[in-house]
Every structure is written in structure tokens, then in C-alpha cells.
Amino acid sequence: MVAAEAMLTLPGDIPLVEADDIRQLIDVHRHATGRGARAFTIVPAWDERGSNAILCSPAAAVPLRFGADSFLPHLAAARRCAIEPKVARMPRIALDIDTPDDLALFLAAPSSTRTRALLEQWRLRLHDAMSPTATG
């Protein structure tokens, strides 16, 4: 069995992330570690409570636990594994959609994502459904 050299974990609710963000995260991780070193790079959520991206090498170097308030426990877990975590602050990865406030932040940010297009479509349908002419 061959062990994975590294593992990148991203949640599915970060609609602003782009390929360049992933490349930048990989570059930050490589720069912080050097080839073959054990390393842990994390991108916190905008409120610094959650963990919105983790790049770990080797893949199983640090046990992961996601959910509410996972950022600080992930930092502590890396340190318990004798790895000093690298924190990368990346705004497009930092914004996840967990609450209505997160959704408002997303809608306030300029973007042309599929998520935004779908939300705009839903908003128009809701507006049409609630208009006086639609309710008769």
C-alpha cells in the first residue's frame, strides 16, 4: 500500500473559491514546508471559528475533526503531532455559507459564480410568487 503524499480537504459550501486559490494554497504549503516535510496548512473561516481548507502532508499526519469551532482544535491537533501549523488567510476560501449572515456576506461580494446565479434565480421566483398579481 502506498501512503498519500498529501491531502487537501475543502468543504462544499465555499462558493467563491477559484482554481487560483487552490494553486496559491498549495504554493503556501510547499513554501512553508520544503519537499517531504510533515506539514499542516489551514485556512480559517472568515470568523476564525471553522476550518475551510486543510492541506496536510503526509495525508494522515494530523487527525481532523470538522464541525462548529474546528479551527482552534485543528491548530492544537497539529501541534500535538509536533507540526507547527501554517495559517493562510484567503478571503475567497474563508467565506462559507453556514448562516443567513454568511449568505448576506456572499451576496454582498461581487461574483459571477453558479451559486450566485442560482440564488438570483430563486430570488426572482420568490419575488414573482409573492407579488400581488401572483396571489390574485
Task: List the model feature ranges, each with a label.
Residues 7:
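Short aromatic/hydrophobic "clamp" motif used to bind/position activated sugar donors
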Residues 37-60, 69-70:
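Conserved catalytic core of nucleotide-sugar-dependent glycosyltransferases
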Residues 69-71, 76-136:
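Conserved alpha/beta core of the MobA/IspD/sugar-nucleotide pyrophosphorylase nucleotidyltransferase superfamily
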Residues 3-4, 37-40, 83:
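Short, high-confidence coil segments that cap the C-terminus of an alpha-helix
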Residues 10-12:
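Active-site acidic Asp-centered loop
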Residues 14-47:
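Conserved donor-nucleotide/metal-binding helix-loop-beta segment in metal-dependent transferases, i.e.
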Residues 54-65, 89-93:
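Phosphate-binding/catalytic loops
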